[in-house]
Regions:
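Glycine-centered loop-to-beta-strand initiation motif
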Residues: 18, 45-63
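A short, Gly/Thr-enriched small/hydrophobic beta-strand-prone motif that recurs across taxa
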Residues: 9-21
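A short, sequence-level motif marking secondary-structure junctions
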Residues: 34-35, 53-54, 64-65, 93-99
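Short aromatic-acidic-glycine turn motif
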Residues: 38-45
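Charged, amphipathic alpha-helical segments
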Residues: 1-2, 56-70
């Protein structure tokens, strides 16, 4: 990688499909907001989806061409929230350092379930700080090169 900034297409956020629940019951018609930021939050992309009548949601992949150099550590802040009874609830927070699809966890989460009444799980298992109210059964292997 060059020390001078050059444009590169990167995956800011992999697609995410799952089920949003509260005390085990699907939350329907609920807005899920995603904010992706980089360069110390001076640049960002924001979008949202609404859960369907079964509580399912599908956030699409977000790709963007950004200028990168060898002098700057690549890191994307991923924040996913919803609001319930007037309270903003953090569902997912991660600092993504991989530029590829499904680089967040090293694979595609299978059977992703996000339970608003659960405690936040905080871990460093995926090379970066990670907080989530979501669980999954397994990670579907995914390979790509950076």
């Amino acid at each position: 990688m060059s020390l001078l900034p050059s444009p590169q297409e990167v995956v800011l956020s992999s697609p995410m499909e799952g089920l949003l629940t509260l005390k085990g019951k699907p939350l329907t018609g609920v807005k899920i907001e995603r904010k992706l930021s980089w360069y110390e939050k001076s640049e960002s992309v924001e979008d949202f989806v609404i859960t369907d009548n079964m509580g399912h949601f599908s956030l699409p992949i977000v790709r963007k061409t950004i200028k990168l150099s060898g002098l700057v550590h690549f890191s994307i802040s991923q924040e996913i929230n919803t609001t319930h009874n007037g309270d903003k609830i953090l569902i997912w927070f991660m600092s993504k350092s991989s530029k590829i699809e499904f680089g967040e966890l090293g694979g595609k989460p299978v059977n992703l379930r996000c339970e608003l009444s659960s405690d936040e799980i905080i871990t460093r298992d995926y090379n970066n700080p990670f907080m989530s109210r979501c669980k999954w059964d397994s990670l579907e292997p995914w390979s790509d090169s950076e």
